[in-house]
A protein has these predicted regions:
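PLP-dependent aminotransferase class I/II
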Residues: 23, 88-256
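PLP-dependent aminotransferase-like
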Residues: 1-51
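A short alpha/beta connector and helix-capping loop motif
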Residues: 59-70, 244, 249-252
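Short, polar loop motifs at secondary-structure junctions
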Residues: 50-58, 188-191
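Short, charged, surface-exposed secondary-structure boundary motifs
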Residues: 8-14, 33, 56-61, 74-78, ...
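Short, acidic/turn-prone active-site loops that include or flank metal/cofactor-
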Residues: 3-9, 27, 52-54, 69-73, ...
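Active-site PLP attachment segment
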Residues: 62-107
Length: 256
């Protein structure tokens, strides 16, 4: 593991040994310049880019790029690998996708809280790391989405949240790096803001909680895990939802 700078670049003191590779995450899909910096510093042949939060960012010339479309669309499973390495295609195809669909259907039915136990159960089935090809069901669902419409809506929602909350946000954001982001990273003033939003049915996910077991107190890594909220800005929502959420954030932060 290595340390990050406040703007999520690889810390200057990080050096690679001769046989090392570097895995860099494009956090929230807003780290285009930081990714380019990692490729320049360490060489594209030694860098693997994790685009699990940056679905709409094209894969650059590097060792490999990993994608997780299920973080962006209603898919039960499946990932994508882009690489020039001679990686053989899996001989086995995933056949368990139907069993992982229940929580997605419950969300469509308007009751995401009721589906949380099924979501946890579905996640546990993905702990099997045997390489398998994407299931037929997931492929068909994936092909049914309008990717460009989703990208445009995410960009519009992100910009609207930034217009409404940017002056309050402690996270420095470069809008030129943003293209189809996972969420809007918001650094708030109140540590209980996440719980308050969830209590009002605004789902704010927690990412990288395992980092707290190894990060130093008051480090950049601890700050991003505990204090930065990934406000939802995906294609399920529009202008009114963004206004309502921004107003709720402002109200909660100003209340005592």
């Amino acid at each position: 593991f290595y340390e990050l700078t406040p703007d999520l670049r690889v810390a200057e003191q990080v050096k690679l040994n001769r046989t090392d590779w570097l895995l860099y995450v494009n956090y929230f899909g807003i780290c285009g310049h930081a990714s380019a910096d990692a490729l320049s510093r360490f060489g594209p042949e030694r860098v693997i880019l994790d685009h699990s939060q940056a679905f709409f960012t094209a894969p650059p010339d590097c060792l490999a790029t990993i994608y997780s479309p299920r973080k962006f669309f209603g898919l039960p499973d499946g990932g994508l690998l882009v690489t020039q390495l001679p990686v053989p295609r899996p001989q086995e195809t995933d056949t368990d996708s139907v069993g992982r669909m229940k929580h997605l259907l419950q969300r469509l039915d308007g009751s995401p809280e009721a589906g949380f136990p099924d979501y946890r159960a579905a996640e546990e089935t993905l702990a099997d790391f045997r390489p398998r090809s994407m299931s037929v069901l997931t492929r068909k669902l994936f092909a049914s989405y309008d990717m460009e419409a989703a990208r445009a809506r995410r960009n519009g929602n992100f910009k609207q949240l930034h217009d409404l909350l940017g002056k309050r946000n402690s996270v420095p954001l470069a809008l030129g790096d943003v293209d189809g982001p996972l969420g809007y990273p918001y650094g708030g003033k109140r540590p209980e803001l996440r719980r308050a939003l969830i209590a009002r049915r605004v789902f704010v996910p927690s990412y990288w909680t395992e980092v707290l077991g190894r990060a130093e107190r008051q480090s950049v890594e601890e700050y991003w895990v505990t204090s930065v909220l990934a406000l939802p800005c995906d294609q399920r929502y529009g202008d009114e939802e963004m206004k309502e959420m921004a107003g709720l954030v402002q109200s909660l932060e100003e209340s005592r």
